[in-house]
Amino acid sequence: PNWNKTIGELKKKRVLFISEPVAGKTNISLPPDDGKKIQILEKDSISHDLNAHNGKDVALSYQLEAYDESYYKYAALSGAAYFTCHTLVRLDSDDYVSMCELTANYITRSEEVVGDSEVFSLASADSSTGAKFNENYSEERKNFLKTNVSDNTILIIDGPLIGNQLSSRTIRLVKDLKERNVATFFVTKNSDSMLLSNEIAPKKYHSDLDWASKNLPSGHRSSFIKYKDLNAGHTEIFCYLKTYAYASPLRISFYPTIYNENKDLVKEVMDMLYFLILDDGNQNNPQVRLIRIAELFAKDIIKIANPDRQVRMSGLIPTVNQSRFGRSL
C-alpha cells in the first residue's frame, strides 16, 4: 500500500541527486573532544583536498601491496564447508604480481562428524559455523600475510580495522607487520558507522557515509578522526575519502602509531589512494585499483577450483536453500 507513496516521497526529497558540495560548506563547528569516543585531529577544516598527481608519484615511490579474499560457503545438513582464496597483489613497475592460497574449512557442531579429523573444526553448540569460520579465517589471513608481505611496504587491506569479531586479531597483525616496517591501511566500502555524524549533527544523517557524501566535495577527504572503543579499548584513526560526486565515499582506517610517527606519510597515502581509485575508473563502484585486482584474482581462482562440484561429489546432503539458491540464507 505504501509503495507509490514512498517512491513519491523519495522523488520529492531527491535523495539520489544531491548537489555537489563546495569547499566552503565544510568549515563547520566541531564539538569539544573531552570524554568523547572520537577526537577530530585536524580542526582547521573538516575537508581536505587530495592531489592525484602527487598520489601517482607516491605510488611509484613506495612498494605497494594489497590484500583481498573471496570465499564460497556450502551449507550441508551435517555442517558447513567454507572455501577461501587469500590473495596478495604487488604493484611492480609494469605489471601486477599475485600470490594466492586456497584453504578449506569444514565446520560442524557434531563431535561424531569431527571424530579424529585433523582438519575438521568443531563449533560450540551455542554458536554458528560462521563464528568459528571467522576465527579460522583470521588465523589463515595472519599466516598468509606474515609469510608473503614484503618488508618496507605499504599494505592495503579490503575491510575494516575495527568493527567486527576480528578486531583484536587484526590489530595484533598490524603490530606484527609494523615491526617489519609495513604500514597497513584498511579500506571499507560499506559501513553503517555514525560516529562522526552523531557528533557533528545528531539525527540529521543516516550514517557517516551519508554525511561524507553530502559534505565533502569530490577529490577531498575528511579530517582524520581518532576513535577509541570504550568497551574493548581498541583505537584507530579513520577518514572518509570522496572521489566521485554521485558515488559512495570510502572509509580509510589505520592504527594510530602510523600517524603519530609519520603524519606526512599518512597524508601522502591518502593522495595515493585517491589516485588508485581514479586509476580504477569505476564511478559506480569506486575501489582502490590494487584491491580490485586482488579481488578479481581471488574470485577467478574460486571459480576455477569449483568447490561446489567438489563438495557435491563427496556425498554431503545440502540444505534446501543451498540446493535452491546455491547458498544458505
Residues covered by each model-derived region:
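Acidic, metal-ligating active-site segments
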Residues: Y72-D116
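Two-metal-ion RNase H-like nuclease active-site motif
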Residues: Y62-Y72
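Long, contiguous domain-sized segments
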Residues: P1-D57, Y62, D116-L329
